[in-house]
Amino acid sequence: MAGGLAAQEAGLADVIFVGRADHVDAPGATVHDPATSDLTDGFAQVFHELRKHKGMDEAKARAAVQTPLVYAAMLVREGHATGTVGGAVATTSDVVRTAIQVIGKAPDAAMVSSFFAMYPPRSPASDANGLSRAMVYSDCGLVIAPSSTELAAIAAQSAGEQGDRGSFGLAGHPSGPQRRWRIAV
């Protein structure tokens, strides 16, 4: 919660915390409790429509949207939020699976990959406002053994998300030398 509050205080985001209000210690913050939210019934109907082809009935859909991951993803899908942060208490696979089931992937995306961004403390590379440039670590665990084509697509997508081509390097991989040729891709 501290990160969300800091982002809000810095004017970087309008944060919505998802969870039980009595468990969220964030005075003045917006809190959505999926168990009591006015949005839950509508979210349950939408989620049921999305997943009924997989055998999900209305009761299971309602139970699912009362979980923080699904509720947060529904906030994004339905336009109440522009993004969601999850993973501190959920596995990467749970976060990604939920996002795919609720939000889906971009129509032009051939695959789903992941990244995380690190913002180092103030450094010579910081801008005039003291903000450091993000270091983006792409697909650190979702596409385990990418082909050269997949690796190139992941790198291009990550650079595009940052608004420029950026510079990048490829770190070591357990499969070693047979992957080194991919750097030229």
Task: For the regions a language model picked out, list residue spans one by one.
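Anion-binding alpha/beta catalytic cores of soluble intermediary-metabolism enzymes, centered on
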Residues: 1-17, 21-185
